[in-house]
Amino acid sequence: IKIYGSMILDYAVKMKVIYSNPMKDVLLPKPKDDITSDDKDKYYSKEELKQFLTLVDNENDIKLTAMFRVLAFTGIRKGELQALEWSDIDFTNNTININKTLALNTEKKVVVQTPKSKSSVRNISIDDQTANILKRWKINQRERFLMIGTRVKKHQPCFTDEVTNSYLYLNFMNANLKRICKKNDFKEIKVHGFRHTHCSLLFESGFTIQEVQDRLGHSDLKTTMSIYAHVTEKQRDNMADKFAKFMAL
């Protein structure tokens, strides 16, 4: 609509009907990460997630293991993951501070910018195993740098190209996800699907809507509720069996 409207107004300017095109100043709203009916199946169940993480472990690449582990066990966005610096991770308190993200600028170059919304800036907790995997990767990263001769930066990102120490290209995770799934004939989802997966499993494990919204940094409760509705629909199918087991003598 904006494109066609702008074309008409451009013509009006050319014909000197109006002085300027007001559509030039109209900003399109950012797309929201709602879960639609078309991608309800684009996530992993608890068992599928376990199976996928095992396939990642079989790659014998601690960097990939760390990256997919963090995605699966925190629900952070791909850009937030790839923008992480070691200083953002508090290994004493097992927390990660999300305060930036990677994006493409108008010149198609990878840049660091503030997260997509105010609520996206947040501290999230991580479990001991995730923390230990990250510690292992941190040591391994330094070993790779030392072997190649790469200098460590003052604000060292957690995940970079080991040779150039530059940020990974934005499609890095999707490319490896696709490769691993194809190699093992395994169900393929998109990287953003790990966010839906984490959200769904949080609800299934008993966390409240507010807790999940805060952890995932959803600015719009509608996004959280769309996944919650999907999970409760699944749980409703099991209500009879669960109640029967509860009442069993």
Regions found by a protein language model. Give the residues of each.
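C-terminal secondary-structure termini that scaffold catalytic or DNA-interacting sites
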Residues: 93, 106-121, 125-132, 136, ...
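Short, contiguous acidic/charged loop-to-helix segments that flank catalytic cores in large enzymes
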Residues: 36-41, 57-59, 111-121, 160-169, ...
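C-terminal catalytic core of tyrosine-transesterase DNA break-rejoin enzymes
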Residues: 14, 69, 73-80, 171-183, ...
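Basic, Lys/Arg- and aromatic-enriched nucleic-acid-binding interface segment
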Residues: 1-3, 14, 18, 23-84, ...
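Active-site/catalytic core of tyrosine-dependent DNA strand-transfer enzymes
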Residues: 45-50, 127-186
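Catalytic-site neighborhood detector that most strongly recognizes the C-terminal catalytic loop/helix
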Residues: 35, 102-104, 216-241
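C-terminal flanking helix
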Residues: 6-9, 13, 232, 236
